[in-house]
């Protein structure tokens, strides 16, 4: 019997979404989501294997090569995507609850964070609505220059565990609005948000095979990246995994986009107040328990200010209240 966190209502967590249908995983195995608060299992969902990956790519390939989505007028794609966004707006409390339970993000931050992410999707729809997919360009002589923006094809969207909704939803948004089909591969630690995205696509009437969902561990994900039916890989995650994806895609001349690890730096100038700098730095260090790309984990300061700033940061850190992520008193 599948398990879900309190407040999360997913219809088929024990299934995969392939070709417009909720289907059982080939292996019958289930993924377990472990709470960072208690180390207890708080949710389970179906685990895809290599056969499931092939089935999802085949469904996305058929939907792109033979289905209506790539040739649907952009305005109609926008309208369908707006229906997805409207559905997601009603699911913000569930998205927040899923994130807090799986990832350990603060409940006090989860609602505004996911509400903002859904608002961002509406802005992407606005951008797509105004984008000119066919553009005339000035040329020399009498010939007419026309640039036609066409969909790439099948996109493998691979998202990490720390921002599982916003990152995956953005990948899906741009792919769908440009006429591509998608295979979503969420992190095995935080896959529930992708289920809600799949349910939103289903509720919006997105054609079968355009959006597919296959949560898995690394081995099956590697098989997905190697599948020649995938035209583009959109990956956010570790540098190590990104190197592997670049190698595989390079060998088969497939497009890929990598958003990898980094070390964000803050540059503190001579004229910036010490206390303000300390509050800013510690605020990012503690956001999402320090597990986020926007964390300013490195500070470049004048040598003369080093000790002063270090002491101010230490004083700020001593005021941090430790607790479970579902405690709304924690900010």
Each language-model region and where it sits:
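Structural signal for hydrophobic packing residues in well-ordered secondary-structure cores
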Residues: 64, 68, 85-92, 96, ...
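Glycine-rich loop-to-alpha-helix module at the N-terminal edge of alpha/beta enzyme cores
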Residues: 42-131
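Short linear capping/connector segments at secondary-structure termini
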Residues: 98-106, 136-141, 326-331
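Terminal low-complexity tails and localization/encapsulation signals of metabolic enzymes
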Residues: 1-45, 79-83, 131-158, 257
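Rossmann-like NAD(P) dinucleotide-binding subdomain of oxidoreductase/dehydrogenase enzymes
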Residues: 133-276
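Residue-level signal for inorganic ion chemistry
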Residues: 39, 77, 99, 179, ...
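ALDH superfamily catalytic-core signature
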Residues: 240-331
């Amino acid at each position: 019997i599948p398990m879900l966190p309190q407040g999360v209502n997913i219809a088929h967590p024990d299934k995969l979404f392939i070709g417009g249908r909720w289907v059982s995983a080939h292996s019958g195995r289930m993924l377990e989501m472990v709470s960072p608060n208690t180390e207890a299992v708080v949710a389970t969902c179906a685990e895809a294997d290599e056969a499931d990956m092939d089935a999802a790519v085949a469904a996305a390939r058929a939907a792109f090569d033979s289905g209506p989505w790539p040739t649907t007028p952009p305005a109609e794609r926008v309208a369908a995507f707006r229906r997805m966004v409207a559905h997601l707006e009603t699911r913000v409390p569930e998205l927040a609850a899923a994130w807090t339970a799986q990832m350990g993000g603060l409940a006090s931050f989860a609602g505004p964070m996911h509400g903002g992410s859904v608002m961002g999707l509406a802005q992407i729809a606005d951008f797509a609505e105004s984008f000119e997919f066919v553009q005339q360009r000035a040329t020399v002589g009498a010939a007419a220059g026309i640039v036609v923006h066409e969909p790439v094809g099948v996109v493998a969207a691979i998202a990490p565990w720390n921002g599982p909704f916003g990152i995956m939803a953005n990948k899906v948004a741009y792919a769908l609005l440009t006429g591509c089909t998608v295979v979503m591969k969420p992190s095995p630690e935080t896959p529930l948000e992708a289920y809600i995205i799949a349910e939103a696509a289903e509720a919006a009437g997105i054609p079968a095979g355009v959006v597919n969902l296959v949560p898995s561990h690394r081995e099956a994900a590697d098989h997905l990246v190697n599948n020649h039916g995938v035209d583009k890989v959109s990956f956010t995650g570790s540098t190590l995994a990104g190197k592997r994806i670049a190698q595989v895609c390079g060998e088969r001349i497939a497009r890929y986009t990598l958003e990898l690890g980094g070390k964000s730096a803050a540059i503190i100038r001579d004229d910036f107040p010490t206390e303000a700098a300390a509050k800013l730095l510690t605020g990012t260090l503690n956001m999402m328990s320090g597990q986020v790309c926007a964390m300013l984990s490195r500070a470049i300061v004048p040598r003369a200010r080093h000790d002063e700033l270090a002491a101010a940061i230490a004083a700020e850190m001593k005021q941090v209240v430790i607790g479970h992520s579902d405690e709304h008193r924690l900010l």
